[in-house]
Structure formats: C-alpha cells, structure tokens
From Swiss-Prot:
Root EC class: hydrolase
Keywords: Endonuclease, Hydrolase, Nuclease, Restriction system
CDD domains listed in its UniProt record: DpnI-like (cd22319)
EC number from the UniProt entry: 3.1.21.4
One MF term in the entry's GO annotations: type II site-specific deoxyribonuclease activity
Family: Belongs to the DpnI type II restriction endonuclease family.
Key word Hydrolase present: yes
Organism: Streptococcus pneumoniae serotype 4 (strain ATCC BAA-334 / TIGR4)
Superkingdom per UniProt: Bacteria
Catalytic activity: Endonucleolytic cleavage of DNA to give specific double-stranded fragments with terminal 5'-phosphates
Lineage: Bacteria, Bacillati, Bacillota, Bacilli, Lactobacillales
Gene: dpnC
Record-linked InterPro entries: DRP, DRP_C, DRP_PD-(D/E)XK_dom, WH-like_DNA-bd_sf
Alphabetical GO biological process terms: DNA restriction-modification system
Protein name as it appears in the record: Type II methyl-directed restriction enzyme DpnI
Amino acid sequence: MELHFNLELVETYKSNSQKARILTEDWVYRQSYCPNCGNNPLNHFENNRPVADFYCNHCSEEFELKSKKGNFSSTINDGAYATMMKRVQADNNPNFFFLTYTKNFEVNNFLVLPKQFVTPKSIIQRKPLAPTARRAGWIGCNIDLSQVPSKGRIFLVQDGQVRDPEKVTKEFKQGLFLRKSSLSSRGWTIEILNCIDKIEGSEFTLEDMYRFESDLKNIFVKNNHIKEKIRQQLQILRDKEIIEFKGRGKYRKL
C-alpha cells in the first residue's frame, strides 16, 4: 500500500477543499480494499450521492469517506444532525472511512468504523449556524469516536504503518454479529465493550465489571437489572470469541 497522494491530479485546481476531496478519494480508490472481504479496488458511487462514496462490488458493503489534514482526533465532522439520527435509527448507514494525512500529503491514519458501531450516543449535535451564515440555522453533527469501543475502530493504516489486511478483515468480521441485534440490544453490547476498554491490562474479573454498574444505570435508566445484563453481555462476547472465560469469574481480552 503506497501512502503518498498523486499530486499531479490537482495541479490545475485552486480550491483547497476540491484538492483534498480529489486526492483522498483517488487514494482510497487506488490503494484501499474492502475491509469485509478484502476485495480490491473499491468502486466509486456517482458524484454527489447523499449517503456513501464507495462500495464493494463483491460483498456490497458501502463506505462514506471523511478526511482531514493534520492529526487524528476523536471528533469527526459529519452532515445534518437530523438526517444522521434518522439514518442511525433506521439502520441504513454506510460504514465510515476516516483518513488523516500530513502536510507532505501522505496518509498517516486510515480507519474504518463499521456502521453497526454508530449509535445515537456517538452522534453529537452541533450549534445552529449563525443568522448571518449562508445556511442560517442549519444544525450539523459530529461523530464522537470516544463513544465507540476499540473493536469498532479498525485501522488499515495507523501512525503511518500499514496493517496486515488479513487482521483487518478478521477484526471487521468479528463485529458483524451486532447487525442482527436491535438498536437497543446493540447499545448494551457496545457499552459493555466500552467498559472492558477502560480496564487496564488483558485480564479482568466479573467484579471489575460490576464497578461500572452505576455508570450503566445512568445510561440505561429504565433497567433495574444491571448486573444481570452485564453477565448476559459477557456471555455474548464469550460466544463471539471477543473475550475468553478463564473460570471463577475471570476473563481475558482477545
């Protein structure tokens, strides 16, 4: 995988935003692959399609590209807040590609956020545009990656290093079971994964998980059986080989 952009494509362009779009989309087309099946190359959707930018003609996964110059951050600008919330709740989102590049026009981070990991909690409403703005009153949103567990942030390129495509596809497929869950059930699994991420080291206990009871109660205020849900979700993650049960209330992250 070559990390440099093809700068010859934008020699006649003056708009920085146009340059960025052309360079990043060209790079994804030439260098990326489908993280679900490994197929290469991905295909472009027609221009100005409102939802996705790329699709895989082998497995039909769709991807929307977001890119920025500079360091990777946990907050990603997206489109209209109301539209995004409808898409998440209707389960008709594409997957997201997030790409960052250096001042030398070289990719330093490129990750995929599988669509099933995007929940209403990870969508942050922005302030309405000022009355003097061209689109006065328009309300956009950000995707908050800090609300997404590590299992939902799959790097193809991380800190300038290309990751093994086989590991990428394995990690992508590992989370596909969530697509069969309801939005509510999926939210529970994602929050349990977030709790596991907060525990240092590769091993943890059931008691470690019970310490998140009050945090989970604040999220799922109508649920009065938090500990039971914790055990249920740990069983699901065991069955999906995301964690390993070592006996006597002990677990290991896989």
